[in-house]
Amino acid sequence: MVTGVQTCALPILRRDFPEHFTLFQALPGVEARLSFEALITWQSTLMYRLRQVRRLLPFSPLLAGDRGWFELLPASGWSYHEELNYYEDLPVFYPATRINFNCTSQQMKGAVNQRVFDVPACGGFLLTDYRRQLENLFEPGREVICYHEEGEIPELVRHYLSRDAERERIAAAGILLLLCHTFAVYL
């Protein structure tokens, strides 16, 4: 479930896995406990993102990034592009892609990640998981599209793949990000 309201790992560990929480408490020192919590957060992010990406497979997505996808997904139903350079490749890639899909790291809780700014700023269309902070930065539904529940992903993808003009209008509205979200505005 995607609610935009995430909690840190420890309350969940205490509530749902008390035997593991006891082991966590027995770890020697703060460093070991922080490392354990980071591991849980990274693993939960991997599991979360993998669930979301699997919902895209009926649409034969292009996945860009490291080769780890080959270990996690079936061999067919998607294509691969190696990692893209942030400064040189992504500003060209984002607007050339019909739907840029984002699922935020679990460590972000209610905050958005950099992709939520980058895709609209480059003139790309963004489908992202809802986070509370989004409403302070964008007008969801006008500048970016959000899914609140995992089950919404296939229908939203189907909808926007079949409506070029609507998708392009939303992407164009997102470009206003360049005018509204600058260092001068926030300083």
Give residue spans per PLM region.
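Loop/turn elements at helix/coil->beta-strand transitions in domains of secreted/extracellular proteins
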Residues: F59-S60, R98
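Catalytic binding pocket for nucleotide-activated donors in carbohydrate/polymer assembly enzymes
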Residues: R67-L187
